[in-house]
Design a protein with these regions (language model features):
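Alpha-helical transmembrane signal-anchor helices
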Residues: 213-256
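A "functional boundary" signal
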Residues: 1-221
Length: 256
């Protein structure tokens, strides 16, 4: 059981080779029946991740085929009402663009979770993906917010929801919040040492950071210009007051 948990942890942090090595060290014949689903899930997860993130398109198809084979095995043994089954069902419906049906399945998952738990964070993150692919920007943001809050309150250091939310805010021009969220997410990623998340968020962080720094420089330039303008106006005011004082003094002397 500990080896399966280790494998899932390794694949979740982008250490795919290490994850597969751990799985291949497990003797399938010695896996007890209650852990068979976990065993298949680990294989499905690592090969599913590889199919998405490998740079080799040929290997991507190969990894996807392996992942689907383990999914089929999971469908055959998982209870239809289980969280694992519902999560797979939701992903399948989402990939088939059946977004309304996918939301209904997600509703079932949310009904079994509590706010500010890892399970709630995962369910709302998956819900944000449904809204993303159905082009509902507001729904995507709302669920990323809910997911990010639950991640933080659950002390989860892998902030996928937060950096995705930061990217959306950046695209909307909300640079201040995008920068703060991305920085917070990046610091957590470094603490967690998540290789995959670091790779995913590095480009976004760099882009947001450069844009934010450019915005700060522009604001500083504008502030400097305003200070120069205020200084010039202040000098003119002093000169004007001096001129008025001299004129009033001349007028007073003339009257005397």
């Amino acid at each position: 059981e500990s080896q399966l948990q280790l494998s899932l942890l390794l694949s979740s942090t982008g250490m795919y080779t290490e994850s597969i090595d751990v799985l291949e060290s497990v003797d399938r014949q010695k896996v007890v029946s209650r852990l068979i689903a976990d065993y298949y899930t680990c294989f499905d997860h690592v090969y599913g991740e590889l199919s998405v993130y490998t740079q080799d398109k040929t290997l991507s198809g190969h990894y996807w085929t392996i992942s689907q084979a383990y999914k089929d095995s999971l469908y055959a043994i998982l209870p239809p009402e289980s969280e694992e089954y519902l999560m797979m069902r939701e992903a399948l419906l989402r990939d088939q663009h059946q977004y309304e049906e996918a939301l209904k399945v997600n509703d079932l998952r949310l009904a079994e979770t509590e706010v500010n738990t890892p399970q709630y964070a995962l369910a709302t993150y998956h819900r944000s993906l449904i809204y993303k692919y159905s082009n509902d920007n507001l729904g995507e943001k709302q669920n990323l917010c809910l997911s990010a809050i639950s991640d933080i309150r659950s002390a989860i250091k892998d902030h996928a929801s937060l950096w995705m939310l930061a990217q959306l805010l950046y695209e909307d021009g909300d640079m201040e919040r995008a920068y703060q969220y991305m920085r917070f997410s990046w610091n957590a990623t470094k603490f967690y040492n998540a290789r995959l998340r670091s790779w995913q968020s590095a480009d976004v962080l760099s882009l947001i950071d450069k844009t934010y720094q450019a915005m700060i420089e522009k604001q500083n330039d504008r502030l400097q210009q305003n200070l120069l303008l205020i200084t010039a106006l202040l000098v003119l005011l002093i000169v004007a007051l001096g001129y008025i004082y001299r004129q009033m003094k001349k007028l007073a002397d003339a009257r005397n």
